[in-house]
Every structure is written in C-alpha cells, then in structure tokens.
C-alpha cells in the first residue's frame, strides 16, 4: 500500500497524509447517508433567468449553495450563500450572505420544477444576471438526503 493512505480494519479508520481532491463527496453511506457535496459550474450571457444548477428533487430534503460568480470584463466577483428546505413540491429558501468586489452580478432563486418526459422533477437554482456580459459560476452544492 501507500504510506500516505492507511486503513485500520480494527478501528474502521482511514488516515491520509496530503490533499484529498474530489468533485463529489458523501458523508454517511447506505441508511446513514446524510450529505453529498458536489462542485458544479454554469455560464450566463443574458439578463434573463438561466438554470445554472439542478438536483433531482426526490433525493433531497435540503440543498445549500455557495456560489462564486465572476465577470472578468467588468472586473467583478460576487459570492452568495443560499440555504433551502424541500418537502414534496414545496421549496423555501433564503439568501443569507452576499458580498461582492465591483458590481453585484446576479440575483438567485431556488424553485421546484416538475418532471417531464426528459427528466425527473428537479430543484433548480436560477441566476438572473445584471448584464449580458459572460458571467461564470462556480457552485458548491451540499445536498442533504431525503431518506
């Protein structure tokens, strides 16, 4: 094995020296699954509302978002924190933190979108940008299990 990664079967503990890199990470497994952290991205070039992130509705009871929006041509960056609670088709959310360098780049909304022939029902994060400049979004999504 690798000396930087050690698994102790007796204590059921894995120890790692160094950096762990992952795009998805789940806390808990099986019946104990609780939270999955995912990294997602989006881009807008319009002032209309755009879906920048979606999560299958049947799998979550809550979703938290950390959004970093960047408009290089406007030399602006906005960071936003949103938390949401989901039950069946009802979604309540609050944007509880926003800070920016330069201009505010977008408003955000979290909505339940019913399923159709192409995809199951989704919890969707929409961005409504302030300009038509290209705005890039990096999103850390924390999905809390519905089971």
List where the protein language model places each region:
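Surface-exposed loop/edge segments in extracytoplasmic proteins
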Residues: 35-37, 75-77, 91-94
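Terminal beta-strand-rich extracellular "head" domains
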Residues: 83-105
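Low-complexity intrinsically disordered segments
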Residues: 102-147
